[in-house]
């Protein structure tokens, strides 16, 4: 009985598992899974958190620095040793005349005194920087800039993943559309085989015509097999992209989203340039180079601060004593001015390089936007041409079918008309898929990644 229940449980898992795996996924769901499970997204989040920790650490430089320490020593010999020999000491008897020639003496025993043979010292320091050449302020600005740059890089990673996921989604969707088109073509050939077979039985056509149709049907079976293999690979690639177990039976839902005409999406390239994350990162690079130059300049300026120290000291057999010290400090790096001036000039040149990179990259970004627009426009034109070609192919097939049934057209012309229609539908599917991808690329190029899905 237990074994029977075990087999029943395994059978239930076998039935339920594929049903769950084949749950249709929409584009929004696919993108959501990719953003949740992609390793690059997780790493970009960690980088943002690390940059925030650096900013928090930099903010602590505004507060006093506190340090504590202690020292214990026990020497085999004291640092200072004082020996006093014994002897007779004159005693004053009250008569001034006897000062030079004492008549009474007292014995003084000799002795030894040791200092710093053993000791305990503990201290607590508090130092508040008053002026550090602007390095604390600029260091905090640089850390905040690094945090913002990490956020921009995270957004770029997110946009790239959305784009790559959308491309794979539309690639799989186009293969499913082609599979449906090929299935319709195969059904059309099957119907034609039956009609040609009936005509052959009636002696209206030659057997060669039936062989031609069957040969075409075999070609369609081969194409269908190749297409199915490609669809399985595309499905598994999409599963890997969105972080779920590989499943060649993955099913998509929602179909094609609305393809907006390119004119509805157009924006002036200059108006959206600064909304690009790449441009924002380049601007931050210029600001970072400027702050690094200021940081180097601060190293050449005087440093000032105040501090307090409390000490607890116990030396040898003496009592424990507590001392307090307040002090101020001023440091002027005189010897660093010569070499530091050259390093400061190097930082200035780095800043100029960053400015040149910003200008050059801005021009490249504008060119990228223009190229994305041209590709989008060409993609829309291709869709229109494919739709016209399908209408013409459908009309051509209708005419050839009527002529074939009337005995006015050869079978080869009918087969060619059917193949042209199937080819036109495949080209329309490719054009639609490519246009949706180009639409995503144009939205990303114009800084509108939020509209990708």
Language model segments and positions:
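Small/polar (Gly/Ser/Thr/Ala-rich) solvent-exposed segments
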Residues: 42, 65-80, 110-117, 127-156, ...
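Bacterial Sec-dependent N-terminal signal peptides
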Residues: 1-27, 35, 453
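Residues on the lipid-exposed face of transmembrane beta-strands in outer-membrane beta-barrel proteins
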Residues: 124-128, 238, 328-332, 431
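Periplasmic alpha-helical coiled-coil/stalk elements that build and connect Gram-negative outer-membrane
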Residues: 25, 53, 154-273, 372-375, ...
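Amphipathic alpha-helical coiled-coil segments
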Residues: 43-58, 157, 161-180, 198, ...
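Bacterial Sec-pathway N-terminal export signals of envelope proteins
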Residues: 21-79, 130, 204-206, 246-290, ...
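Acidic, low-complexity, intrinsically disordered peripheral segments
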Residues: 67, 76-80, 84-90, 427-453
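Transmembrane beta-barrel architecture of outer-membrane proteins
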Residues: 119-121, 167, 212, 303, ...
């Amino acid at each position: 009985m237990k074994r029977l229940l075990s087999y029943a449980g395994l059978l239930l898992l076998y039935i339920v598992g594929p049903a769950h795996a084949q749950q249709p996924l929409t584009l929004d769901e696919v993108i959501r899974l990719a953003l949740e499970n992609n390793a690059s997204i997780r790493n970009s989040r960690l980088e943002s958190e690390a940059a925030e920790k650096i900013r928090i650490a930099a903010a602590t430089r505004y507060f006093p620095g506190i340090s504590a320490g202690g020292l214990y020593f026990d020497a085999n010999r004291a640092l200072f040793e004082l020996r006093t020999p014994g002897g007779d000491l004159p005693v004053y008897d009250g008569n001034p005349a006897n000062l030079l020639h004492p008549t009474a003496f007292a014995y003084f025993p000799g002795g030894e005194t040791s200092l710093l043979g053993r000791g305990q010292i503990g201290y607590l320091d508090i130092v508040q920087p008053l002026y550090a050449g602007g390095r604390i302020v600029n260091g905090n600005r640089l850390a905040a800039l690094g945090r913002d740059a990490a956020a921009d890089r995270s957004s770029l990673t997110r946009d790239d993943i959305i784009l790559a996921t959308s491309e794979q989604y539309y690639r799989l969707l186009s293969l499913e559309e082609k599979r449906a088109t090929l299935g319709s073509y195969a059904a059309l050939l099957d119907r034609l085989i039956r009609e040609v077979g009936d005509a052959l039985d009636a002696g209206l056509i030659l057997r060669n015509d039936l062989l031609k149709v069957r040969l075409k049907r075999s070609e369609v079976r081969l194409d269908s097999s190749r297409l199915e293999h490609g669809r399985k690979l595309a499905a598994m690639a999409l599963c890997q992209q969105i972080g779920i177990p590989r499943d060649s039976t993955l099913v998509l839902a929602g179909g094609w989203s609305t393809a907006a005409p390119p004119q509805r999406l157009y924006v002036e390239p200059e108006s959206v340039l600064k909304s690009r994350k790449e441009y924002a990162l380049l601007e931050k690079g210029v600001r970072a180079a400027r702050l690094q130059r200021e940081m180097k300049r601060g190293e050449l300026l005087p440093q000032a601060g105040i501090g307090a120290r409390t000490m607890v000291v116990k030396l040898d057999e003496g009592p424990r004593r507590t001392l307090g010290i307040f002090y101020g400090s001023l440091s002027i790096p005189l010897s660093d001015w010569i070499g530091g001036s050259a390093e400061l000039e190097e930082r200035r040149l780095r800043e100029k390089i960053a400015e040149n990179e910003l200008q050059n990259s801005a021009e490249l970004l504008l060119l990228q936007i223009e190229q994305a627009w041209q590709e989008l426009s060409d993609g829309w034109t291709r869709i229109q041409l494919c739709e016209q070609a399908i209408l013409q192919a459908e009309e051509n097939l209708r005419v050839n079918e009527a002529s074939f049934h009337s005995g006015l057209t050869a079978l080869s012309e009918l087969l060619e008309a059917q193949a042209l229609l199937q080819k036109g539908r495949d080209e329309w599917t490719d054009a639609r898929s490519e246009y949706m991808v180009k639409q995503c690329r144009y939205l990303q190029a114009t800084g509108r990644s939020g509209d990708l899905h």
